[in-house]
Every structure is written in C-alpha cells, then in structure tokens.
Amino acid sequence: MATFRSEFNSVPNTYNQRLTALKKKLTTCFQQWRQQLLKLHQQQQQPKQQQQQQQHQSQHQHQQQKQKQRGSEHFYNIFVRADCSILSEKVTYLRKFKRIFTARQNLASARTAATAASAKQPVLGRCIGQEEQQLQIVASLFSSTLISKHSSSASITSSSMTIMDNTYIGVRDEYPDIDTEIRSILLANAQNGITISSIKKEYRQLTGTAFPLHDNITDFLLTIPHVTAECCESGKRIFNIKPTEHTRHLHEMILQQRQRDSVSNPIQAQEPPRLWRAQYKRRIPQHFNFNLNTSEKPPAVKISKLQPLATAAAMSNDVYQDNWKHLNNQYQLPQLNAPKNNIHSHIASNPAQLQAALPAEHHPSKHVEEYAHKRRHEYTRTPTTLSCPSTQHDSMFTINSDYDAYLLDFPLLGDDFFLYLARMELKCRFKKFEKVLQSGLCISGQTINAARQRLRLVELPEMTQIIVNIGSEDIMRGRSLVQIEHDFRLLVKEMHNRRFVPVLTTLAPLANCRHDKQTCDKVSRFNKFIRSEGRHLKVIDIHSCLINENGIVRFDCFQNGPRSVTGSSEPYVFWNKIGRQRVLHMIEENLEYY
C-alpha cells in the first residue's frame, strides 16, 4: 500500500507548490488583518482623559483605518489577481469569500466621520465582531485545505498547518468524551490503521450510539491531537494515532501483537484443508512392483460405530488445521480375516521379515486382495518407521509399542503439550479405546501427582532417561506453588528410586494466561525451582526458546486460539508447527546418551 504522510501535524501533504504559495499569502494577510483589528480594539478601550487626546486618538484611528484599507487593498490585489485556476473544485468557496470581502469594504465605506464619539465605541465593537465572524466563516469554508488556525499570540512566521476546531465545539459539548473514545479506537487499531466506516462501526459498538457527525468527518478527526491520516493507492483514508508518553507502552504492546487472519466466513475457517484426505492415503510397502490403485477393491462392509475417542472428536466444534492429522485413525473398519491381518501386520512391522518373505511369494494378486482388506490405520506410520519425511524431522523410534510417546530411545513424560508434540511431530499414536487421550507416559490433563502414580506401574530398563515436562496443569488449576514444588520433588525421588534418569525441562509460557500476572509469576518461579532442583541433573530450558531477547512471548509459535482437551476443564493454547519444531530442536540439542 503506497502511503504518504504530511510533514505537518494531521494534514496530508498532497498540494502543489502554487497552491502552497497561495495558502501562505492568504495566511499572512489574515494574520496582519487580525492584528490590526486587535490593536484597534485595544486602543478603543483605553480611558480618554482629555478631549484633545480623544481628537488625537480619532485622528490616529482615522489613520489606522486608512492603513487597514491599504492593507485590505493589498490583500485584494493579492487575492483577486492570484491565479486560482488550480482551485477548480473550490470555486464555490472562492465566490462566497469574495462576497464577504465586498460586504466588508461596503461596511467600511458606510462609516461617517461625523458620528459622535460616544457612538463610535459600540459601532467599532460591532464592526470588529462582524470582521471576526467573517474570518471564522472564511476559515470554515477553506477548512484544512487553505486556512490554518493561529491564536492571537502566535508568531507571524509560524507555519504549522492544523484545522480550526471551533466548528466542532457544539459536538464536543454534547459528547464530552468523544475525543477519548476515538483515540482509544485508533490506539486499538494502531497496527494497520482504520477507515472512517470502521471507526463509525466500532464507535457504535463501544458507546451504543451512532457517530454524531455525517459530514466533514476527516476534518473533525484531524482536530483531535496526535491523529494522523494516510491515503492508500485505492484512495481510502487510513487514520492512526501517534503515541504519547502515557500511551507509549500500550502502543508498543499493540504493535507487537499477532495480526489476526482476516477470514470473511467463520464457517469456512473451521473446514479442513482441501483434499486433506489425499495426504494420508494408505501407505503400501514400496517393495511391491504392482500398483494397488488399479487393482484394489473397496471392502463391501458397513462402517462400524465410532469409538469413544472418535465420538469425542466428532462432538468438538473447534478444528485446527495443524492438528487435523489425529483424525486420520478415528474411523475404522471392522476386523475381518483377523489371522491374515495379524500375520501381515506382523510382517509389515518387521522390514527384515518382509524382505525375506518377498522372494517366496509367487502370486502377487493374492496379496493385493489381502492388503485390500487391511484396516486403514494399519497403513499409517508407526513408531517403528521414520517419524517424518526427510524434509521434516529425521528422528527414529526404537520402541516396539505403537502407542508410547518416545523421542528416539527417550520416553516422554508430560501433559497435553508433550502429548501433542509426540502426536504431531513424532507420529506417535493415541491409545485406543480411551476417553482421555494418552500416549505412553503423556496423558491429557496429567498432574504431577498423577504422573508419579503412573510411573510406579511402568516397566522400563534401568538408567532409562525420561524427558519430563509437567506442571502446567497444576498451575492452571490454581494449586499453590509450594504444593506443586513438593509433588515435583516426590516425582524426581520416585524416578531415582526406580533407577531412572530424569531429564528435566522448564515449563513453556501459557499463552492464554499472559493477562494474569499471578499465573505468569507462578510459572517463572516454578521454572526457577526446576533449575535449582536439577543443578545436578540435565535441565533443558524450553521456556527460553519461546520468548525473544526482550522477554516477550513469541506468539507466532502458538496456535490462534485455545482448545479444549479431553483430560482437563482448562483450555490450552498449543504450540503450532513453528513452536513444536523449536521445542523439538531445543530438546535434541541437549540430549546425549550415557
């Protein structure tokens, strides 16, 4: 968007040099005219001590009137003889101005020198008032394009171009808080600015009343201090506000916020990406030389009822594109030909046996029919294969279970954050037939105490390094910090008793609790406790990779909104693809085998 901004306050710099020269001449003439009127008014108010002084004063006034007429004639020569061809759209205003100027000269010529001295003061005061009113009328006609507002004490050499706000005194008297309300609207939209129509709409939502002005809204907005205007290529005027000392912190906070994606239809925003099923089609071993797409026949069976996990997923209305993959295994076919499927599933899970079995097969069409009856989820990648394509992450699982959350040989222990990290990046699968999503030692809504109870039942080799990231659920439930720290110490002690090696990680920032200072302080203090508790252990600082150098949370590493989880009543704002990759990279950089 091509924009331009005036070097003066609140006025777009869009006029050529000829118009600028004319404006300067008009401004100088009006200043001289007004100063002469003020001097004349001050002289009329001085006490008249002697008649000679009154006569001398009348002569002096007569000379001042002559000088004023000369100044007016000089102004007339400047104004009438000026080349106004560039002001084609202002012809109506120029005509009105000439009529006012002619009426003013006729009024000056109608004065008689024989008027009594006692009658001169009200007449002169009335004339001065009329001339002041004429100046205000002319200023309102030319608005922000020709006339600049100058106070009586302003310097003649001043050239600041602003708009006279005397016209909108009535509006501000009727709506005393309108300037503050408009400034708050502009400050809330400081990232990209806001148009007049949007200002009207937000003003109605904020106050419950319609915007009081219908004409000259641009001029009115520019009378508000620190308001600026820009113009884009399409011609729309974009308004914004400059920060002050009191609002600079709010202005910087708004500029650092994530920009919302403009979606015209909220229903379309919840739809999955187009042709998303094609990304998760059945994986066929690449060792076969035949094409299953030409010979595969769909099974002639009805789809079974949804499992409890699928039912819970179907009832949820919130859909996030980067978490859509977990629905891949929700809709399953009944287990037909169980012995055959089990045999082929066992062969497919062991690539060495699969390669040994291939030379002995002589009827590929038979295998095509058998693989056509395999369930959909049996073709998806399991932890025994590469977790991601070569373009993503290259970690490999060495665990035989299809459900445990592992990073290489390191089991993960945590709540929803590690659970979805394992599902989305490491391709671990949720345990079937469970209402609460879980994978290995990662369970949705798991607290520290629940993790300690579950750790007693797990069977793992001694000296197994377990990556621990837990405590967010306890903090979101509002538990006291000392109780959380006590449970965490018991968890570490239980791992030592089982001869496991804990790899501690700090808690990530809770994106949906950043407004709560008490919660943020509790997260910071708990992370400090983890570093102190793990001074003799390995501690991975996940929190540092999700904040910038100024300590501000990287909201571009989080999803756009909170999401309800199956194991907790508290919603979570999960990490998006960027955040998960940053966390995974941080963990792998600090891992090593003993």
Swiss-Prot record:
Keywords: Developmental protein. PROSITE patterns: HTH_OST. The keyword Transit peptide does not apply. Organizes the germ plasm and directs localization of the posterior determinant nanos. Oskar protein is required to keep oskar RNA and staufen protein at the posterior pole. GO terms for cellular component: germ cell nucleus; P granule; posterior cell cortex. Posterior pole of the oocyte. The keyword Protease does not apply. GO terms for molecular function: mRNA binding. Residues 44-62 have a biased composition (Low complexity). It comes from the Eukaryota. This is Maternal effect protein oskar. Residues 174-243 form the HTH OST-type domain. Residues 44-68 are annotated as: Disordered. InterPro entries: LOTUS-like (IPR041966), OSK (IPR033447), OST-HTH/LOTUS_dom (IPR025605), SGNH_hydro_sf (IPR036514). One of its GO terms (biological process) is cortical actin cytoskeleton organization. Interacts with smaug (smg).
